[in-house]
């Protein structure tokens, strides 16, 4: 089969969304030839890396890579992948290196196939359905150093394999470690190599995204990034596994950066008195500022504590698990918010939408009706097909907009999967309404308080941040940890949800933040 003849939809049934990143979306897929067979052996994760510009000659792939085969056939070459998105091309390069030098490995995500079309590149990956690392731990009845050592051993095993292939992950954190399945003895897989680099071959992706909690001192100081940078990140993960909080805690982001670069952390007696000395010694070696003095992944695999020989097999203080639960909830909320901000294109969509519908001005009750009709007509409540969107417009008697339905729909179908996010369309229409003051803030807030509970959940906060036009975000938004600071301003009592009073108070404390949020409902 020649280039350009294969289509993802010909071979896979693509279903629900498993997750979103700033530059990608991951969905569950089932191989069509196996739909009636054992689904457990035919289900995959399909990661679509969105391209910023269409290729003049998008290429398909000649055939599927047989599992275990070390051929590079099936990967678009750099000439064939004519895209401007550095992250897209970088991830393809790294995944090709993994296929050639690492796969299959019990602790590294496996890549089965690659497809390319005008919308982007689709990576067909091993499906990890066992949940994130911290989710599994906080749900356990018993948790001890032994369980933590098993986790570290598996991560070190995966890192040793990718490091041997000269790959630096550069974004190692709990959410990038998933269990393969729900079995108690399920292997833990390292995934998401979008920010990775191949030593002496590719340049590391420029910039730091999200929290700096796991970032090494050399990365913060823009020094040389090596495999030892991943070992620092593993040290941070281990510290959290044994205490329930990160090693570097500060009043603001600048102070935290300084603490990291100085390696300024401690083992507080109240928390760490029950933790073994070998565990603390291991953390200290991993969180050494000088990268050359940190142990390698290979050395870690022979460490007595990591092997379980010196890890305490007694249940940890329940307070540690409680803190870990709280930390995990906030981490997930921030991750969702950060991904949403980086995926934002609502500003450009709103300008195009306004050019289509002119001065059509929706009142607040019309926006509410639009939301209600979406939920009533759309099968999955949050996403609409074109025909469902047209039915919504008809039900609302918005007849003047029906001729533009397909064009409006196309603005919001960013990944060209034939569906659009209801909340993004709501926000787009709301942007045509010029509101001010508290009414404007309440409109922003209520638009995403979909269950009318009086507070915004983590998913709803993520949607709200997605609606912020990038052009209006603070100029320092790309600084490490800046997005964490913005969220901290909103969630004043750290309970993982934001009330309107908290939301409004954050706006009043920071006028620049208010300008950012209000920009999402102004033309």
Curated annotation (Swiss-Prot):
The keyword Magnesium does not apply. Autophosphorylation. GO terms for molecular function: ATP binding; calcium ion binding; calcium-dependent protein serine/threonine kinase activity; calcium/calmodulin-dependent protein kinase activity; calmodulin binding; protein serine kinase activity. Ca(2+) 1 binds at residues 413, 415, 417, 419, 424. The keyword Transferase applies. InterPro entries: CDPK_Ser/Thr_kinases, EF-hand-dom_pair, EF_Hand_1_Ca_BS, EF_hand_dom, Kinase-like_dom_sf, Prot_kinase_dom, Protein_kinase_ATP_BS, Ser/Thr_kinase_AS. Activated by calcium. Autophosphorylation may play an important role in the regulation of the kinase activity. The gene is CCAMK. GO terms for biological process: intracellular signal transduction; nodulation. Its EC number is 2.7.11.17. Its main location: nucleus. Residues 329-342 are annotated as: Calmodulin-binding. Belongs to the protein kinase superfamily. CAMK Ser/Thr protein kinase family. CaMK subfamily. Highly expressed in roots. Expressed in root hairs and nodules. Expressed at low levels in flowers. Not detected in leaves or stems. Ca(2+) 2 binds at residues 449, 451, 453, 455, 460. Ca(2+) 3 binds at residues 491, 493, 495, 497, 502. It is found in: Nucleus. ATP binds at residues 18-26, 47. Induction: Small up-regulation in nodules. This is Calcium and calcium/calmodulin-dependent serine/threonine-protein kinase DMI-3. During nodulation, plays a central role in bacterial infection and contributes to nodule organogenesis. Protein kinase that recognizes the calcium spiking induced by Nod factors and translates this signal to components controlling nodulation and mycorrhizal infection responses. May phosphorylate the NSP1 protein. Required in epidermal and cortical cells to promote infection thread (IT) formation in root hairs. GO terms for cellular component: cytoplasm; nucleus. Interacts with IPD3. Residues 400-435, 436-471, 478-513 form the EF-hand domain. Keywords: ATP-binding, Calcium, Calmodulin-binding, Kinase, Metal-binding, Nodulation, Nucleotide-binding, Nucleus, Phosphoprotein, Repeat, Serine/threonine-protein kinase, Transferase. It catalyses: L-seryl-[protein] + ATP = O-phospho-L-seryl-[protein] + ADP + H(+); L-threonyl-[protein] + ATP = O-phospho-L-threonyl-[protein] + ADP + H(+). The active site is at 171 (proton acceptor).
């Amino acid at each position: 089969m020649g280039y350009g003849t294969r289509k993802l939809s010909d071979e896979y049934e693509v279903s629900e969304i498993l997750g979103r990143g700033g530059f990608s979306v991951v969905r569950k897929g089932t191989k069509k030839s196996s739909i009636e067979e054992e689904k457990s052996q035919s289900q995959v994760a399909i990661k679509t890396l969105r391209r910023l510009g269409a290729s003049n000659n998008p290429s398909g792939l000649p055939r599927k890579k047989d599992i275990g085969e070390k051929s590079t056939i099936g990967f678009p070459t750099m000439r064939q992948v004519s895209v401007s998105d550095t992250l897209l091309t970088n991830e393809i390069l790294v995944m090709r290196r993994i296929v050639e030098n690492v796969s299959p490995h019990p602790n590294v995500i496996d890549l089965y196939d690659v497809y390319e079309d005008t919308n982007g590149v689709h990576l067909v990956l091993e499906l990890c359905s066992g949940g994130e690392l911290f989710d599994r731990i906080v749900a356990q009845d018993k948790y001890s150093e032994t369980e933590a050592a098993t986790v570290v051993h598996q991560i070190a095993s995966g890192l040793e394999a990718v490091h041997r292939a000269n790959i630096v992950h550069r974004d190692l954190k709990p959410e990038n470690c998933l269990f393969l399945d729900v079995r108690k003895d399920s292997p833990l897989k390292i995934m998401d190599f979008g920010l990775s680099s191949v030593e002496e071959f590719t340049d590391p992706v420029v910039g730091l995204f999200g929290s700096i909690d796991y970032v090494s001192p050399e990365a913060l100081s823009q020094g040389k990034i090596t495999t030892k940078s991943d070992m620092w990140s593993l040290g941070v993960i281990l510290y959290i596994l044994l205490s329930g909080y990160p090693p570097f805690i500060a009043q603001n982001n600048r102070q935290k950066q300084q603490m990291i670069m100085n390696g300024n952390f401690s083992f507080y007696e109240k928390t760490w008195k029950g933790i073994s000395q070998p565990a603390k010694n291991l953390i200290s070696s991993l969180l050494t500022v000088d990268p050359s003095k940190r142990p390698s992944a290979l050395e870690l695999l022979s460490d007595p504590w990591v092997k379980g020989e010196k890890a305490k097999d007694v249940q940890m203080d329940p307070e540690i698990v409680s803190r870990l639960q709280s930390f995990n909830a906030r981490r997930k909320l921030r991750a969702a918010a950060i991904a949403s901000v980086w995926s934002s294109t609502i500003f450009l969509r709103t300008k195009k939408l306004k050019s289509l519908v002119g001065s059509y001005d929706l009142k607040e009750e019309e926006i509410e009706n639009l939301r209600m009709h979406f939920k009533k007509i759309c099968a999955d409540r949050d996403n609409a097909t074109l025909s469902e969107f047209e039915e919504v417009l008809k039900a609302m008697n918005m007849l003047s907009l029906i001729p533009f339905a397909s064009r409006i729909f196309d603005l919001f179908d960013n990944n060209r999967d034939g569906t659009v996010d209801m909340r993004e369309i709501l926000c787009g229409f709301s942007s045509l309404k010029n509101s001010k003051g508290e009414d404007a803030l309440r409109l922003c807030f209520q638009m995403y308080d979909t269950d009318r509970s009086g507070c915004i959940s983590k998913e709803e906060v993520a949607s709200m941040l997605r609606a912020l036009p990038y052009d209006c975000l603070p100029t320092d938004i790309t600084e490490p940890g800046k997005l964490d600071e913005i969220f901290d301003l909103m969630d004043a009592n750290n309970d993982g949800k934001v009330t309107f009073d908290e939301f409004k108070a954050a706006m009043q404390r920071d006028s620049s933040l208010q300008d950012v949020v209000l920009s999402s409902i102004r033309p």
